[in-house]
Amino acid sequence: MDLWPWYLLYLITVVMPTCPGEAGEGYTQVTTNGEEGCVSPWQFMSSSNIYLIKSNMSYGNITCIKARTSAKDQNTQTLSHVVYVMLNSQKWFAMNATYNPLTKDANGTATAFTSVDGNVTTNYTFALLDTYYAIVRKEKGSSFEDLRESCELWVNDEYFRPDCTAKKLRCEENFCKMCEPKREMSYDCYNCTKPQ
C-alpha cells in the first residue's frame, strides 16, 4: 500500500499550520512574524493607542491620526475608539468608532473587523500582524460602486520604545512589500498627542 498520499495529507493539515515560520511567503488573512509572539487582531486593535504612520492612499490635509481605545470587550471581541485627527492647520477633531468582528477563525477569534458610521461601512482585514504593528487592508464605502480600498501601516505604543529601531525598519519594509504603494503617504505619529 502506498502511504505517500497520507503523508502529504498529514503534512498539509498538521505540520504546516503549526509551523508558520517555516511556511513560504504569501498572503493570508491573519499572519504574524512570530518574533514577539502571536497576537490577535483584537489584541492589537485594543491597544491603548494606535497610530497611522503610512498609507498607500492620501487623506488630504491630515497630519496624523491617533485612535485611543475607549471601551473593549474581550468576550465579544468588540471595541470602541476615540479617533483624533490633526489637520495640517494644527486643528484637531475627534470622532467615535465602534468595531465588531466581521469574520472569525475556527477558534472563534476575530480575524477582521467592521465599523459603520452613518451609511458608510469600513472593513479592516489584517495582512500582517505583530505586537507593535499591523498592516491593514481597508475597504470603505456605502456601496460596492463607492468602495475605496487602501493599505495602511498602524503601530501602537510599543513602536516608540528605544530598543525598537530594527523593528521599525522591518515593519516599514513589510509595508512596502505588502502594500506596493505607488505613492507612499507618511503621517507624523511622533507629534500626534491629543488636543488639550
Predicted regions and their residues:
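A beta-rich soluble binding module of mature secreted/lumenal proteins
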Residues: 2-196
